[in-house]
Amino acid sequence: MKKLLILFACLPLLGACTQTEPVSGNRAAAIVAEIHNPRSKNVVVASHRGDWRYYPENSIAAIESVIGMGVDIMELDLKLTKDSVLVLCHDRTIDRTTSGKGRVCDITYDSIRRCVLKTGHGVKTTHRMPTLREALEVCKDRIVVNVDQGYEYYDLVLAVTEELGVTDQILIKGKRSTDAVAAKFAEHPRNMMYMPIIDILKPQGRALFAEYQEKGIAPLAYEVCWNKYTPEVKECMDKVVAGGSKLWVNSLWASLCGGLDDDAAFGGDPAEVYGKLVDMGATMIQTDRPELLISYLRSRGLHN
């Protein structure tokens, strides 16, 4: 299969590309190299919204915490303020995560900064909602960043990553067609990593996966989601691995992984959860229990 390496804007999207080695010895570059290596048995760990069990989600403190525990990828969410500032926020409103109220798109950045972030239990803290720029300054050279809910802001995100010199350590995912992604990436001389999301038991997901397979495209990785493990799911995963791509799975909640989720691992035997995901071929796992997952993987020699 032709290798789709979008990290350094290898275009056209559907053509063959040459892998580029990381230019420095920093930790983020080493993680990027791991993502580019389908033969590696190490499992890349992504932390969902950072260490939100101990700090407000998508906060600088939550980012620093997961960097400290050895997480490989920080997943964060983006929204655009009324005055066009990209901030870290999952919801359309700031009601749940801050002391304020209202839709992000209706509020200026200065107004949002006057609010404080809340913990997952709704307790107010002294932390403030960071901008994308602030978050990337913290992450630079230290951890790969998965910008979730970010494809619609692609040009704005890329402008920030290029200015900060971190484009090569940013991953964006989506459900767009190969042609749509190719057209977007053709607009820029350099691009971020891109990974398709495949809801394999849904018609749209089946169609997107079939499109990649029929065109002979092997992206760096596929994110595969399923609510029940079936022969179709197994076949999809086997094709991903055989085709030379990484397999990203989510252990966040049961409907994304057929019940092999973080709560099951925390309340039971991690080997019966994370172990099964690894045995299915997963080499990238997004989790809400990064410490538990890393501990298990290290016990099997699958994480540094």
Pin down the residues of each PLM region.
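Bacterial Sec-dependent N-terminal signal peptides
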Residues: M1-R27
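Phosphate-group recognition and catalysis centered on beta-loop-alpha active-site segments
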Residues: C17-N304
